[in-house]
Amino acid sequence: MSESGPAYRRAHVTELDSLPNELVEAEWKPVRGAFGIDAFGANAYVAGATGELVIQRHVERKVAHQELYVVLAGEARFTIDGEQFDAPVGTLVFCEPRADRTAHANEPGTTVLAIGAAAGKQFEVSPWETQRTPAA
């Protein structure tokens, strides 16, 4: 983030651009890129229909990111290490890097914010993100 210009920015998730992402069915909104965040990863996923994949199944073995998911709208069904549970709006779900996780929308408009970084390390953008975002 630059030292010049405003010290804060704001936007509604619906105002953020969506980019193509073959990993999920929901709209991918690269929050980190929209705000120029360089200390942690941040992405939003907005489902258009019930059952859409909002968080792809994955484990953070390579980048070792701890991840926090925040359900901003609707309700998501998470499956983490084989345990399934519903997460209504306002739910926070924290995953250690070793957790095998995925989530689907239980209703249209379900919106999940994902925030992540590796503990104790300088943040590096995940390879999956750099492969899917336009060059700066």
Positions of predicted regions on the chain:
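Short, surface-exposed beta-edge/turn micro-motifs
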Residues: 39, 65-68, 109-110
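Short, conserved beta-strand element in jelly-roll/cupin
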Residues: 47, 61-78
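A short, N-terminal "cap"/entry segment at the start of jelly-roll beta-barrel domains
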Residues: 1-53, 132-136
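Short acidic-glycine-tyrosine-enriched beta hairpin
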Residues: 82-98
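Short, surface-exposed loop/helix-turn segments at secondary-structure junctions
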Residues: 54-60
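Structural motif
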Residues: 75-77, 84, 100, 109
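Double-stranded beta-helix
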Residues: 2-13, 106-136
